[in-house]
């Protein structure tokens, strides 16, 4: 890890409904940044952020964890939070340390109750919100359907990035 000035560091909380793929997305970010050379899998119990024995056993995040990622001269502290309501305190804790929120949705499930809840948390905190539609490799996933659901639930300000 290099040394970074404060204006080159971002704290981004990753939030979303349970099983939307937040931890797997964090693993993909780590491998693409070169921080790791093999992507861990939740099912195999070898991800960077879900290291607690109970998380490995349950195959889900129970506590908030921070994953530092260096990318294009910036340092991103990705704050991986649990997706189930039982651990809402952990989500709020992660959001408290964040400059922005990345809400992860499953392209198959679309907008879920947990998605709506974390959106409310981020709006209350007043941080910029980004959405990431995940799990697009599922044959029943639909980016367009998920985008339309997001516009319906969160307003017309939802605009896709076409890059």
At which residue positions do the language-model features occur?
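Low-complexity, flexible helical/coil segments
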Residues: 49-52, 114-117, 138-140
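Histidine-centered acyl-transfer/condensation active-site motif
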Residues: 131
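Canonical P-loop GTPase G-domain recognition
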Residues: 128, 137-163
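Amphipathic helical hotspot of TIR/SEFIR-family domains
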Residues: 110-126
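Loop/turn elements at helix/coil->beta-strand transitions in domains of secreted/extracellular proteins
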Residues: 100, 126-127
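Active-site glycine-centered loops adjacent to acidic/histidine catalytic or metal-binding residues
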Residues: 134
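P-loop NTPase switch module centered on the Walker A-proximal segment
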Residues: 1-105, 109-111, 145, 154, ...
């Amino acid at each position: 890890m290099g040394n970074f000035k404060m204006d080159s560091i971002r704290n981004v909380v990753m939030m979303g409904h349970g099983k939307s793929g937040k931890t797997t997305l964090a693993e993909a970010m780590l491998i693409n940044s070169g921080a790791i050379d093999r992507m861990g899998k939740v099912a195999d119990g070898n991800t960077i952020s879900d290291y607690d024995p109970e998380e490995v056993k349950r195959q889900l995040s129970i506590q908030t964890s921070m994953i530092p990622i260096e990318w294009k001269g910036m340092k991103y502290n990705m704050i991986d939070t649990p997706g189930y309501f039982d651990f809402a305190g952990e989500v709020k804790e992660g959001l408290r340390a964040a400059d922005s929120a990345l809400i992860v949705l499953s392209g198959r499930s679309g907008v879920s109750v947990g998605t709506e809840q974390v959106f409310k948390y981020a709006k209350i905190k007043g941080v910029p919100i980004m959405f990431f539609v995940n799990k697009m490799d599922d044959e029943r996933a639909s980016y367009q359907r998920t985008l339309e659901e997001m516009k319906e639930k969160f307003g017309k300000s939802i605009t896709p990035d076409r890059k």
